[in-house]
Amino acid sequence: MARLGVNIDHVATIRQARGGAEPDPVAAAAIAELAGADGITIHLREDRRHIQDRDLRLLRQTIKTRLNLEMAATDEMVSIALSVKPDMCTLVPEKRQELTTEGGLDVRLHLDAIRGAVQKLQDGGLIVSLFIDPDTDQIKAADKSGADYIEIHTGAFAEASDWKAEQEELKKIENAIKLAGKLGLGVNAGHGLNYSNIRKVAALGGIEEYNIGHSIISKAVLVGLDRAVRDMVDLVKYS
């Protein structure tokens, strides 16, 4: 049965908009866990635009499920990860001008640097995933990097303009799942997944964990975080 990792970055985004202490993403994580989330995902960006070091530290101390830390493959972030010891580190690309992560890592282009970061993290006893597009060459490069998992970037599927484009993107995801399996890589997925489209990806099978944030927090504004998480848990686990 697939797992749901709830990304709470946007709780921190709301807090940072006023520069205060509320809403606290640490409290949000506790509510998400009680509602059935299998893990909590956060992205500690280099510019600290939403999640702060304090959040990461407290979440590591309080989370009862699993903590997935999204991070750039920089010396600073590797050092932080080795100190905090999340249950999984997901390496993601990062641009200061972007509103959210816009695409997958180019593992082919940056293979040496990514391989080095993966090795350091694994030497520290950490499990490493790479956030990549559902592209054959990128998956093969991820395997060469020594990573344990890939997280398939589902943004192109989520943003498909029509049925035909959506089916093409679903096929890419399906092929990516199969190739990763043959290479011995675990498979997670995320980006742009919501209450309307998650069933289509879940029907493919082969994905261990879905990391979903924006749609859950958006619904939580209207119905509460507990209900929003429970509804997504039902879709992920029983679709």
From Swiss-Prot:
Organism of origin is Geotalea daltonii (strain DSM 22248 / JCM 15807 / FRC-32)
The residues that hold 1-deoxy-D-xylulose 5-phosphate are D9, H10, R45, H50, T100
Q: Which UniProt keywords apply?
A: Cytoplasm, Pyridoxine biosynthesis, Transferase
Gene of origin? Answer: pdxJ
Localization per record: Cytoplasm
What name goes with this protein? Pyridoxine 5'-phosphate synthase
Q: Mind telling me which InterPro entries this protein's record contains?
A: Aldolase_TIM, PyrdxlP_synth_PdxJ, Pyridoxine-5'_phos_synth
EC no. given is 2.6.99.2
Q: What is the catalytic activity of this protein?
A: 3-amino-2-oxopropyl phosphate + 1-deoxy-D-xylulose 5-phosphate = pyridoxine 5'-phosphate + phosphate + 2 H2O + H(+)
Keyword check for Secreted, yes or no: no
| Residues holding 3-amino-2-oxopropyl phosphate | N7, R18, G192, G213, H214
The family assignment reads: Belongs to the PNP synthase family.
Which is an annotated GO molecular function term of this record?
Answer: pyridoxine 5'-phosphate synthase activity
List the SUPFAM superfamilies hit by this protein, alphabetically. Answer: Pyridoxine 5'-phosphate synthase
